[in-house]
């Protein structure tokens, strides 16, 4: 049986409070999308990991749970505050998942942030880019999603991430971003099921989005 691991690393720093409600709704919609994929392709086992992070914590809301066992999140699960240890969160999350996956598995990593790295102590940029470049050779696909106050393309490139998406940090922009991501995730999953190769930098390439700003 094919196994697909969905890892979502979400910024929970203080500035995300502007879109707190929409971010929570978007995460729930993403969970629903993965569950729908599981229902559509029962012989392709879907796993979900969601980590949120700020300067006070790197917390797993879900830690490698089967999609069928995942339930919707509530307000208590997402409460923005603190600074942005982006490299630590990404490094910890992908290293932990790497320890339990094999080369036969597919891993889709989604990183969502509205701020730049500012307080990591365990992982440096060089460590992250080296780790990501290594994992990309073993059926790992990475996407980096950031707000329009950031140079999202440059941040993604610095980490060796080929897929990037910029969105406006307001209710409408956040909702549109998650809608785009869901379409792309569904397409990605169908391609895996069909045995199609996943092209470099192709995750967000669809009629719905070509790395457009929302």
Language-model regions, residue ranges each:
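Acidic, low-complexity intrinsically disordered regions
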Residues: 1-214
């Amino acid at each position: 049986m094919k196994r697909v691991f969905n890892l979502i690393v979400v910024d929970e720093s203080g500035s995300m409070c502007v879109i707190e409600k929409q971010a929570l709704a978007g995460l729930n919609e993403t969970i629903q999308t993965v569950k729908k994929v599981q229902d559509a392709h029962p012989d392709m086992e879907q796993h979900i990991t969601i980590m949120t992070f700020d300067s006070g914590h790197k917390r797993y809301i879900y830690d490698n749970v089967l999609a069928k066992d995942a339930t919707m999140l509530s307000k208590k699960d997402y409460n923005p505050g603190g600074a942005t240890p982006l490299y630590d969160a990404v490094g910890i999350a992908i290293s932990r998942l790497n320890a339990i996956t094999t080369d036969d598995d597919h891993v889709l990593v989604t990183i969502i942030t509205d701020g730049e790295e500012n307080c990591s102590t365990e992982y440096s940029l060089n460590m992250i880019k080296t780790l990501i470049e290594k994992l990309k050779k073993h059926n790992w696909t990475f996407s980096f999603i950031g707000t329009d106050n950031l140079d999202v393309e440059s941040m993604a490139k610095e980490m060796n991430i080929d897929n990037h998406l910029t969105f406006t940090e307001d209710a409408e922009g956040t909702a549109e971003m998650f809608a785009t991501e869901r379409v792309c995730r569904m397409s990605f999953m169908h391609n895996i099921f069909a045995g199609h190769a996943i092209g470099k930098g192709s995750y967000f390439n669809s009629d719905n989005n070509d790395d457009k700003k929302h």
